[in-house]
Curated annotation (Swiss-Prot):
One Gene Ontology term, aspect cellular component: cytoplasm
Gene name per UniProt: adk
Originating species: Enterococcus faecalis (strain ATCC 700802 / V583)
The protein's name in its UniProt record: Adenylate kinase
Positions with a binding annotation for AMP: T31, R36, E57, L58, V59, G85, F86, P87, R88, Q92, R161, R172
InterPro entries referenced in this protein's UniProt entry, alphabetically: Adenyl_kin_sub (IPR006259), Adenylat/UMP-CMP_kin (IPR000850), Adenylat_kinase_CS (IPR033690), Adenylate_kinase_lid-dom (IPR007862), P-loop_NTPase (IPR027417)
Primary localisation category: cytoplasm
Enzymatic reactions: AMP + ATP = 2 ADP
PROSITE patterns (UniProt xref): ADENYLATE_KINASE (PS00113)
Compartments, as annotated in UniProt: Cytoplasm
Length: 216
């Protein structure tokens, strides 16, 4: 079973990925892990990627695609894999199709965990931090026991990181929505696309994920 897992930040993709791996025993192939392994092992492509990352530049598609292909050629992917964080662009999706054909493999299903934008903003923009000790809270999922008082140090001053502010979160989501739309359309055209409502209990969402995997 060869899967691609998609979903916007805050949709619970990481949690579902863990459950898929635990249940089906297939390798979790995430872009971050692939880059780290390629750089640690000092492969030619890993060193090339490192040269861009060290300069704070985006790694070009041909380098990323090469690292992905090297990983998908490893024997542990022969019985299936879960791709997470790739493809990020339509060009990468097309390149993935080509490399899988060369490896005599194919994608069986693309699962998109869909959560409404306002819910994602609520989830992502709810984090705040104690200015005194750095303890992290979330207004919905992990508020202080006493409102306005830090559980750890008793401080009363809190702040939000720039990344967690609603406007920043909104902009980040807009960029993600725009870049993922052509990829979703590409896989829909191939009849591989499955969209799941992610605004439910984790196990309920996974029950739907499992159904899709078992039917493929």
């Amino acid at each position: 079973m060869n899967l691609i897992l998609m979903g916007l930040p805050g949709a619970g993709k990481g949690t579902q990925a863990e459950k898929i791996i635990d249940t089906y025993g297939i390798p979790h192939i995430s872009t971050g892990d692939m880059f780290r392994a390629a750089m640690k092992n000092e492969t030619a492509l890993g060193l090339e990627a490192k040269s861009y990352i060290d300069k704070g530049e985006l790694v070009p598609d041909e380098v990323t695609n090469g690292i992905v292909k090297e990983r998908l050629a490893e024997p542990d992917t022969d019985k299936g894999f879960l791709l997470d964080g790739f493809p990020r662009t339509l060009d990468q999706a097309k390149a993935l199709d080509t490399m899988l054909k060369e490896l005599n493999k194919k994608i069986d299903a693309v699962i998109d965990i869909h959560v409404e934008e306002d819910v994602l903003i609520e989830r992502l923009a709810g984090r705040f931090i104690c200015r005194t000790c750095g303890a992290t809270y979330h207004k919905l999922f992990n508020p202080p026991k006493v409102e306005g008082t830090c559980d750890r140090c008793g401080g009363h001053e809190f702040y939000q990181r720039e990344d967690d502010k609603p406007e920043t979160v909104k902009n980040r989501l807009a960029v993600n929505i725009e870049s993922s739309a052509p990829i979703l359309a590409f896989y829909k055209e191939q009849g591989l696309m499955h969209t799941i409502d992610g605004n439910r209990e984790i196990d309920t969402v996974f029950s739907d994920v499992k159904k899709i995997i078992d039917e493929n």
